[in-house]
């Protein structure tokens, strides 16, 4: 009897010991696994965040340093997990390096070639179309592209629109009553590849009322001089116009700049564009703008504009989209940096997939543009 009791105690103790060992081993494995993942879970264990993604901007953007403020409109999650800096000391610890195409020089190129880091992506950021991007021959230097094109590694558009969860309240009468002028064209660059100047001047000859402003015509609005006007003066100046010319300096794949987004957005005008295909390919609602190439000739286009100008019901059809969609405030294209942070966070503590552009010029080439459009109307 006594022997049986001792045997039972021994078996019970052995069972408890085995269970304890399994629990400790399992717990230890879980801790080690979570350490490898950079995260701790459980009771009194300290929560440890994955280190922030560090994006080093090796060049400025048109001489203006690119800093953390570029993330100001990103989600809080992204802002808390990412840092953007132009501090040269971050080069050895950076998770990515960004170069703006118009600000790269031979000195920088030589340094970063000589001191190449193969564990992180070198990123070419180009917001201009191929005619103005300023690219020279970069062979086997860049790993990722960050441009306005949807097929970029990082899509970096000038603007975007999102569908509203709840239909917005739109005061159509207020919009109509604020419109006292027909069409505005504010333009600075006269060196366009697509003959936009000639097309606009032809429209005027056909009877379209267009007010011309900007460096090209050496005329600035007195109440809102370029870069010197009071805050909000641009909205006040543009808002009375029913339409605004939004011709880009080249007709290129996916190339839609702030010329379009601001006019449709904060200015509440109807943008006039050259060709519908570029905008439709981006999924922009057809009713947000008017395209010249919807008409067989300029006479019919001008007739349509004149008809819509004097007809409230017809004009307001171009504002119906405001109930369903809203334009995202892009703040000069920071959408791309939000997406870059998100993508890099997914690669944190992993090897970034290896990829290199053998010849970047062949990717960002003028073959993605068609500047012959206007000639059929001239």
Swiss-Prot record:
Pathway(s) this gene product operates in, as recorded in its UniProt entry: Protein modification; protein glycosylation
Reactions the enzyme catalyzes: a beta-D-galactosyl-(1->3)-N-acetyl-beta-D-glucosaminyl derivative + GDP-beta-L-fucose = a beta-D-galactosyl-(1->3)-[alpha-L-fucosyl-(1->4)]-N-acetyl-beta-D-glucosaminyl derivative + GDP + H(+)
GO molecular function: 3-galactosyl-N-acetylglucosaminide 4-alpha-L-fucosyltransferase activity; metal ion binding
Processing after translation: N-glycosylated.
Modes of activity regulation: Inhibited by Cu(2+) and Ni(2+), and to a lesser extent by EDTA, Mn(2+) and Mg(2+).
Annotated glycosylation sites: 44, 88, 105, 143, 171, 307
Entry's transmembrane regions: 8-28
Compartment annotation: Golgi apparatus, Golgi stack membrane
Signal peptide stretch: none
Ranges in the topological domain labelled Lumenal: 29-378
Enzyme class name: transferase
Topological domains, Cytoplasmic: 1-7
Temperature dependence of activity: Optimum temperature is 23 degrees Celsius. Vey low activity at 37 degrees Celsius.
A single BP term in Gene Ontology: protein glycosylation
Family designation: Belongs to the glycosyltransferase 10 family.
Primary role: Catalyzes the addition of fucose in alpha 1-3 linkage to GalNAc-beta-1->4-GlcNAc-beta-1->3-Gal-beta-1->4-Glc (LDNT)acceptor. Unlike fut-1, does not add fucose to Man-alpha-1->3-(Man-alpha-1->6)-Man-beta-1->4-GlcNAc-beta-1->4-GlcNAc-beta-1-Asn (M3), Man-alpha-1->3-(Man-alpha-1->6)-Man-beta-1->4-GlcNAc-beta-1->4-(Fuc-alpha-1->6)-GlcNAc-beta-1-Asn (M3F6) or GlcNAc-beta-1->2-Man-alpha-1->3-(GlcNAc-beta-1->2-Man-alpha-1->6)-Man-beta-1-4-GlcNAc-beta-1->4-(Fuc-alpha-1->6)-GlcNAc-beta-1-Asn (GnM3F6) acceptors.
This protein's name: Alpha-(1,3)-fucosyltransferase fut-5
Organism of origin: Caenorhabditis elegans
Encoding gene, per UniProt annotation: fut-5
